[in-house]
């Protein structure tokens, strides 16, 4: 399904938080949405792998990597696991690598930047905790909507079928 964050903001402005514009698209899917699962880790992606091995239908993984630009928290192998388990998308407050592989995958991926250096795999971090970056506090089970324009967050699911919110014009005799 396609999502348009600009249209969603126009309709639901009082219900959404807008993440500061700092992310770039790296995945093959330009827009994505779902209920978030959070991982908070720093230069260590073991918990990301563990989480992506779960069923991801209707879910978006939100990774607070502390904004580190020194190591990539997501690579082609982890993105393939996410795609296989049907995750809608991944947002990384940090870096990714193997970007040519990422853009060929049917998953939405947004991150700060890319770097070729991989992360450690020691399992240090937390899952399903509130995280804060980009001027927004993300709570587990909030709903995230992302496209090439930006990322928005809502406590409740938003109707993506924007057509149904418009009234049909009355026909005059």
Curated annotation (Swiss-Prot):
Which GO cellular component terms are attached? cytoplasm
What keywords appear on the UniProt entry?
Answer: Cytoplasm
Q: What highest taxon heads this organism's lineage?
A: Bacteria
Q: Which positions, given as ranges, span the membrane?
A: none
Entries under SUPFAM superfamilies matching the protein: RraA-like
Tell where it localizes.
Answer: Cytoplasm
What are the protein's GO molecular function terms? endoribonuclease inhibitor activity; enzyme binding
Write down the InterPro entries for this protein, in alphabetical order.
RraA, RraA/RraA-like, RraA/RraA-like_sf, RraA_gpbac
Predominant location = cytoplasm
Q: What GO biological process, any one, is recorded here?
A: regulation of RNA metabolic process
Which HAMAP family does the entry mention? RraA
Question: What is this protein's function per UniProt?
Answer: Globally modulates RNA abundance by binding to RNase E (Rne) and regulating its endonucleolytic activity. Can modulate Rne action in a substrate-dependent manner by altering the composition of the degradosome. Modulates RNA-binding and helicase activities of the degradosome.
Per UniProt, subunit arrangement is: Homotrimer. Binds to both RNA-binding sites in the C-terminal region of Rne and to RhlB.
| Entry's family note | Belongs to the RraA family.
Q: Please report the name of this protein according to its UniProt entry.
A: Regulator of ribonuclease activity A
